[in-house]
Design a protein with these regions (language model features):
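Compact alpha-helical subdomains of small soluble proteins
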Residues: 71-137
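Immediate post-signal-peptide N-terminus of mature secreted/exported proteins
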Residues: 20-69, 131-137
Length: 137
């Protein structure tokens, strides 16, 4: 209940702050765009590990590779938005970089284990999966 009151107060004050020039709308939209891109990159890291873990034979490895190439394409699409982090204030930059780093660390052990397994199984004979993994490096 108290969060609803805080949110309502913020929602009422925000347009006033923008009108008085206290908050730059361009800065807010850039920060929002960067944060959205960073959040998506965090989700993508988990998705990559899940796709790699789904490879159990050649057929599933080929299917995972196809999806991985789409994910890689999405990461490339997000790059311009992520690069705008430079225009955010230092505190925002630090917060967003920390968030991305924590997401990377959180999936790091799983990614290493699944990578080792894929190498041991020679990518289940899937050249597509091998190419997708190379493209991510």
């Amino acid at each position: 209940m108290k969060y609803a009151a805080i949110f309502a107060a913020f929602a009422m004050c925000f347009p006033v702050c923008m009108a008085q020039g206290i908050v730059d709308p361009a800065a807010v939209s850039v920060e929002s765009k960067v944060e959205t891109a960073i959040n998506e990159l965090c989700d993508i890291q988990v998705k990559i590990v899940e796709l790699l873990e789904s490879a159990k034979d050649k057929e599933s490895a080929d299917a995972a590779a196809e999806e991985l190439f789409m994910v890689i394409g999405r990461v490339q699409e997000l790059q311009p938005d992520v690069q705008q982090i430079r225009s955010c204030d230092a505190a925002t930059q630090q917060r967003l970089v920390k968030k991305l780093l924590q997401a990377t660390i959180a999936v790091g052990a799983r990614k290493k284990a699944v990578g080792k397994s894929l190498v041991e199984h020679q990518f289940y004979g899937s050249e597509d999966l091998k190419d997708a993994v190379r493209a991510m490096l």
